[in-house]
């Protein structure tokens, strides 16, 4: 409608070398819509009579109803995101058709819960509300000056014109949605957040047009991450600031792509508290030259226990900030029987990440049954301030 070039559906794997690109026939090319619903405990038994349009034989048609990972009556709210449909249709032109199918599904599932006799614990619950508009995950994606891809997300490529960021996994859903037999989604998590460049928010085809939200210039795979609401809103903030600068200086949106001008946009965003990965301060900001003084100080030397012991049913870690030497840690460990406790010092391979993917030091402690007092001294120091992980991992003898 605007006259700008756009795409709809998945790219071939060979176009960008994206290994996560789906098989278009088997997996599908589009993510579907979902409608959420709200249930309420009334405190007394409530009957439910399903409307005529409610889906019948839901257990046969929706295999995941037999999978407790996806379906159990203790789950509420967004846990039913997988009631999804429309990935095999046109998610723009067929949206009304998709909505009515989702209504059939929701009322059919609720009828199954209330009237199959398998869920007596739901006797007092009523279906309080069903959404009127489906949540949309994917439709058109416009072509900008840059196309963000899987590699930009996973490898966390640096962008000179970064104005936003994302942190959701690459989250793709099979086009068959709720009627599918496999997993309801496939996710690939980056080791940290990634930058979104301004070039993804501007199209070369229309001089005075910004693109934002789910329709920015990204591949189908990358859209699996950038499509979520907080990421879309963060990009919208960048667009709003860019529009203000363009109006003030009588510029076109594309003029701000210039490496000199983009710095002004980034600085303006930073001054409002807008976070940009890798960018600490904008032009003319005071923190780089500021000095902080205090009339007194308190050095924290000990953290007293404030509860019972934390049971290590699985490995666990403590995330702590360090500025040079790693502090020596003393702690009490209780063992049900003689065993070995491995304590690892881990860090992230990239500054700004919070993934313990680098093991810097490992210590082993033989524990006797009962109470053990341990002193953990890694003898390590780091050149720059960062977060590190103290990881407690059991290796049974």
Question: Can you name each region flagged by the protein language model?
Answer:
Residues 334-338:
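Short solvent-exposed strand-capping/beta-turn motif centered on an Asx-Ser/Thr pair
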Residues 327-329:
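Structural beta-strand segments of beta-rich domains
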Residues 331, 373-397:
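Extracellular beta-strand ligand-recognition surfaces/modules
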Residues 1-325, 339, 343-360, 365-370, ...:
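Flavin (FAD/FMN)-binding glycine-rich loop and adjacent Rossmann-like elements that form
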């Amino acid at each position: 409608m605007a006259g700008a070039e756009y795409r709809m559906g998945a790219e071939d794997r060979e176009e960008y070398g994206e290994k996560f690109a789906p098989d278009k026939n088997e997996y599908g090319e589009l993510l579907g819509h979902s409608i959420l619903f709200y249930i309420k405990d009334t405190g007394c038994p409530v009957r439910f009579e399903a409307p005529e349009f409610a889906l019948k034989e839901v257990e046969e048609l929706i295999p995941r109803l037999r999978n407790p990972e996806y379906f159990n009556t203790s789950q509420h709210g967004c846990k039913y995101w997988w009631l999804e449909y429309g990935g095999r249709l046109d998610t723009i032109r067929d949206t009304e058709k998709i909505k009515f199918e989702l209504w059939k599904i929701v009322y059919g599932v609720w009828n199954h819960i209330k009237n199959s006799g398998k869920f007596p614990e739901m006797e007092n619950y009523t279906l309080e509300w069903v959404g009127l508009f489906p949540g949309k995950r994917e439709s058109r994606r416009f072509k900008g000056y840059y196309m963000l891809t899987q590699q930009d997300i996973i490898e966390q490529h640096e962008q000179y014109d970064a104005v936003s960021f994302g942190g959701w996994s690459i989250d793709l859903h099979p086009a068959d949605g709720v009627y599918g037999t496999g997993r309801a989604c496939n996710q690939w998590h980056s080791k940290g957040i990634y930058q979104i460049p301004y070039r993804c928010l501007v199209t070369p085809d229309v001089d005075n047009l910004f693109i934002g939200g789910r329709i920015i210039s990204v591949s189908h795979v990358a859209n699996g991450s950038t499509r979520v609401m907080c990421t879309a809103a963060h990009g919208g903030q960048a667009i709003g600031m860019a529009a203000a600068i363009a109006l003030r200086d009588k510029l076109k949106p594309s003029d701000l792509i210039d490496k000199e001008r983009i710095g002004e946009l980034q600085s303006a965003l930073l001054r409002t508290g807008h976070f940009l990965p890798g960018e600490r301060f904008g032009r003319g900001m005071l923190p780089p030259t500021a000095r902080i003084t205090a009339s007194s100080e308190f050095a924290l030397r000990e953290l007293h226990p404030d509860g019972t012991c934390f049971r290590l049913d699985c490995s666990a870690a403590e995330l702590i900030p360090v500025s040079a030497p790693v502090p020596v840690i003393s702690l009490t460990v209780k063992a049900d029987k003689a065993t070995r406790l491995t304590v690892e010092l881990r860090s992230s391979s990239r500054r700004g990440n919070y993934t313990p993917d680098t093991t810097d030091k490992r210590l082993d402690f033989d524990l006797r049954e009962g109470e053990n007092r341990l002193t953990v001294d890694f003898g390590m120091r780091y050149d720059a301030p960062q977060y590190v992980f103290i990881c407690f991992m059991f290796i049974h003898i």
